Amino acid sequence: MAEELILEIVTPEKMAFSSVVEEVTIPGSEGEFGVYKGHESLLSSVDIGELSFTVKNKKHYYAVNTGFAEVTSEKVTVLVETAEEAELIDKERAMRAQARAEQEMAKLSKEDLEYEKLRASLARAINRIGVAGRI
């Protein structure tokens, strides 16, 4: 069994986080799942949601976008489009993005190609607001 669990959160732009953690909870596309040291290996898709982890008994939160997670007994690598630490999220900006997406969606039919992009933008904004509210 592994002595420690390393978490890496990686985006196309940067390594958002890399350190030893006690546990991590990931928003998988089939629902959230928790990982502790010694976990069985798996590969999962990641959905828009809240990723949380514990370091020295303190909980940390990130708003993540879609991607993948690779889990081994010693390491969790989360590769996502975006990852924002709760403390760094501009909640007011996220609220403006939510309002903008809702207004634009109201003008379109669900069959419109732009509608799905706006729906994804709305989901990201709502997630960012929720994660920012954790602090």
Curated annotation (Swiss-Prot):
Main subcellular localisation: membrane
Record InterPro entries: ATP_F1_dsu/esu_C_sf (IPR036794), ATP_synth_F1_dsu/esu (IPR001469), ATP_synth_F1_dsu/esu_N (IPR020546), ATP_synth_F1_esu_C (IPR020547), ATPsynth_dsu/esu_N (IPR036771)
Gene Ontology molecular functions: ATP binding; proton-transporting ATP synthase activity, rotational mechanism
Annotated localization: Cell inner membrane
Protein's membrane topology: Peripheral membrane protein
Keyword Ion transport on entry: yes
Single GO cellular component term: plasma membrane
Keywords: ATP synthesis, Cell inner membrane, Cell membrane, CF(1), Hydrogen ion transport, Ion transport, Membrane, Transport
Superkingdom of this protein's organism: Bacteria
Subunit structure: F-type ATPases have 2 components, CF(1) - the catalytic core - and CF(0) - the membrane proton channel. CF(1) has five subunits: alpha(3), beta(3), gamma(1), delta(1), epsilon(1). CF(0) has three main subunits: a, b and c.
Annotated function: Produces ATP from ADP in the presence of a proton gradient across the membrane.
Protein family according to the UniProt entry: Belongs to the ATPase epsilon chain family.
Protein name, UniProt field: ATP synthase epsilon chain
Species assigned in the record: Syntrophus aciditrophicus (strain SB)
Gene: atpC
